[in-house]
């Protein structure tokens, strides 16, 4: 396990711990307290991850793993800048026109993950191209995503879990 994978797993663990601790607190913290938390912890607490969350965390992962320039300030980018960056890397489809606040569906996350990992599953996808549906099936088959409905919106903690598995898969490659 590399240092990067360990770091991402630690971030995920901290996020999940924060969710657990927050569930024990009777008075939810105010927006001011939440704004001081790391983005990964704030996202882990969300019942539904957004497209903006996914784009931000995938860009951070790509920067951490050297897929994009380490000097790139992904935290300072707006949604359209993140979209352009991920589109340039081939992680998102050019036809996507999502609202940043839209819920992140499992099949969309699977497409991003399969593209990030450069997964080329089979004959049909080599002919017709990668789709969100087949990406989701392939990510499930590889154990990178859990079973569920493809159009179901993922939680923040599920988003972090999938990204951690992606990081581990990427780091285990020669």
Predicted regions and their residues:
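Terminal recognition/anchoring or ligand-binding modules at protein termini
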Residues: 2-5, 23-70, 96-174
């Amino acid at each position: 396990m590399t240092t990067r994978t360990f770091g991402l797993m630690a971030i995920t663990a901290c996020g999940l711990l924060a969710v657990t601790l927050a569930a024990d607190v009777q008075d939810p913290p105010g927006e001011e307290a939440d704004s001081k938390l790391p983005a990964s912890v704030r996202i882990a607490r969300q019942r539904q991850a957004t497209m903006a969350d996914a784009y931000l965390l995938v860009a951070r992962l790509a920067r951490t793993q050297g897929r994009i320039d380490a000097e790139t300030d992904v935290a300072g980018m707006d949604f359209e800048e993140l979209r352009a960056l991920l589109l340039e890397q081939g992680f998102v489809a050019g036809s996507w026109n999502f609202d940043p606040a839209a819920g992140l569906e499992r099949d969309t996350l699977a497409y991003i993950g399969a593209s990030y990992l450069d997964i080329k599953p089979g004959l049909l996808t080599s002919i017709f191209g990668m789709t969100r549906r087949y990406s989701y099936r392939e990510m499930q088959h590889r154990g990178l995503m859990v079973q569920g409905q493809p159009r179901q919106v993922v939680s923040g903690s599920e988003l972090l879990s999938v990204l951690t598995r992606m990081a581990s898969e990427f780091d285990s490659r020669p």
